[in-house]
Every structure is written in C-alpha cells, then in structure tokens.
C-alpha cells in the first residue's frame, strides 16, 4: 500500500510533523541512544585517540579502529556542522561564466583612436627606462660618469663652524 495514499496527501504535500526533505540541504540526526556512544567517544578521545571511525561502533577498542575511518563531526545539538551539509552546485555553470564579460577588441581600438599617447611616445619612454644614461650624457661626449646614477654621499659637507665667545661657558663646569 502506498504511504501517501494511506495518509490522504498528494505527492507534493507534507504534513507539519514530517522532517524536511534531504533536498533542503540539511541533515536530521537521531539522538536516541547516542549519549552512551558519545560518552565512549569522548573517553576514547581523552585517552589519546585522534578520531572516532564512522563505520566502526564507538565501543570497539584498539588501534585498528582509529586508523580505518573518521567520524562525522556534529555540534552539541546533533546537527551537522555547516561545512558538512549536502553538496550543491559549488560554482556557476560554464555558460554563465562565459556571459559575464564579452570583450570586443574592435570597440576598444575605436575608443583608443583619440588617445593622446601613441606608440612612438610609449616606445620612447621604454628606451629611456632601459638606457637611463642616454638622457644624462652630454650630446657630444658619450663617456659614462658613474656619479649620474648614484645617490649623493651620506656624509654631508659641513661648512666651518664659528662659535661665539661665551657660548659654551656653562659646559665647562
């Protein structure tokens, strides 16, 4: 006998007492009899176990039960953590990603027609970046002077200091 026909509900109808379907992305947990398993699991974790296997009962002992699998972690109220919810579409389909931005190079070239900087300006600035001494060298003499591209010395040049008479009289005491 069909359970839906026995209750008198249609295929899309749910009663208010039913749990939400798995399609909603949430998992329901049965907490009956889990307190003793939880206590045993806590005791095992306190004794040095790294995890509790999911497919082996919590009362199993020995190192093999720790190595075979991992338990599904749950919050104190028994619900799954947020990162353990049922899987859904993680990224948009490729068709949608392709439609986000359409690039029209012809339109970009037309937009650049009024650009005050043309290729000659760009090439001139690149050649100065590659050979910075070209702008500093005198036109008739191509001898390179290393001081053109070095910072000034760290020791400042001081002029001769002149002291006034009586300026440091109190310092002698």
From Swiss-Prot:
It is found in: Nucleus. GO terms for biological process: blastocyst hatching; chromatin remodeling; muscle organ development. InterPro entries: COPR5 (IPR029289). It comes from the Eukaryota. One of its GO terms (cellular component) is nucleus. Keywords: Acetylation, Chromatin regulator, Myogenesis, Nucleus, Phosphoprotein, Transcription, Transcription regulation. Its main location: nucleus. The modification N-acetylmethionine is found at residue 1. Residues 1-70 are annotated as: Disordered. The modification Phosphoserine is found at residues 64-65. GO terms for molecular function: histone binding. Histone-binding protein required for histone H4 methyltransferase activity of PRMT5. Specifically required for histone H4 'Arg-3' methylation mediated by PRMT5, but not histone H3 'Arg-8' methylation, suggesting that it modulates the substrate specificity of PRMT5. Specifically interacts with the N-terminus of histone H4 but not with histone H3, suggesting that it acts by promoting the association between histone H4 and PRMT5. Involved in CCNE1 promoter repression. Interacts with PRMT5. Interacts with histone H4; specifically interacts with the N-terminus of histone H4 but not with histone H3. Interacts with CBFB. Found in a complex with PRMT5, RUNX1 and CBFB. This is Coordinator of PRMT5 and differentiation stimulator. It comes from Mus musculus.
